[in-house]
Amino acid sequence: VMQAHPALLRAFADSGAVMIADSRVDNLRRVSEAGLGLPTMLLRAPTPRNAAESVYWADYSLISSAESATALSHAAASAGRRHSVVVMVDVGDLREGVWPDRAVEVVTQISRLPHLGLAGLGTNLACYGGVIPTAEKMRQLIDVRQQCREATGLPLDLLSGGNSANLPLLASGQMPSEINQLRIGEA
């Protein structure tokens, strides 16, 4: 919606935004060209065909499969860099992510890819299936992260709890403290 408009990007940066995320690589290119120095996140899982431009313009990518991760790892190798990924876990919305009972397996596979950094886990609610974010859904994500930590030995520091639909949960004080990122800004 904002299409990486420079004035809006500056307003976000001046207001304390610590990262800019977008679902379109072209907009992330504009973010980079704006020179804010903020890390960027690609919200749409990249296809193997656009993995190279995803790695070039985004610091982080949300992914839902080992196949996407493999494509990003190859692209990062070709670019001579590391790329950070957030593995999405579907805790009920039926839109994106690996099932909780497969998360350890998928995260373990991804952790072996040489040119990726596994930043953490995320989820998306109140989108396709209309599942409302709750403290219980967030705790489910926290539990999956703990299982993945134990299996891989990785910190998985980033725990992205969802989008703007999570704001009521945050405002009510019911958001678990382990959730340290929300992707705010619905279209």
Each model region followed by its residue ranges:
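Active-site-adjacent beta->alpha loops and helix N-cap segments on the catalytic face
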Residues: 25-30, 67-81, 130-140
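Short, acidic/turn-prone active-site loops that include or flank metal/cofactor-
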Residues: 24-26, 44-49, 66-68, 89, ...
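A generic, well-ordered mixed alpha/beta core segment in the N-terminal half of proteins
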Residues: 56-93
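N-terminal active-site wall of soluble small-molecule enzyme domains
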Residues: 1-58, 169
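Short catalytic-loop micro-motif centered on adjacent basic/acidic residues
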Residues: 40-42, 61-63, 158-160
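Active-site loop/helix belt of alpha/beta enzymes
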Residues: 3-6, 10-11, 15, 83, ...
